[in-house]
Amino acid sequence: MVKSMKTNNRKGGYSASTANEYIDSKQAIYCLSTELETQIKFEDGQPTGEIIAYKAWFTQKGLPPFQVKFPSEVALPNYMTMVEFDNLEACEVGYNVYFRATDIKEVKY
């Protein structure tokens, strides 16, 4: 069964416990992105050109693809490589779930 990535219960701010409600730590996570997407800072509705974060897409069995934001540029592994995150946290905003982590590592079998 595919779980929805819509919120279960809304709480404020990012937390590891919220991430654990959505991501199963016993299941493999795979990298879908082959390059990072940049997030640009906006002021007064206009882009400043300043990069404030990097994002990439991942998947886990039973979940829709999900995006994780990183505060600095990370080295993405190859497409469909099994990965794990450093300090994965999630935040529920409205009915959406947003993820962030400090780094990513390839899982060696």
List the predicted regions and their residue ranges.
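OB-fold and OB-like single-stranded nucleic-acid-recognition modules
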Residues: M1-Y109
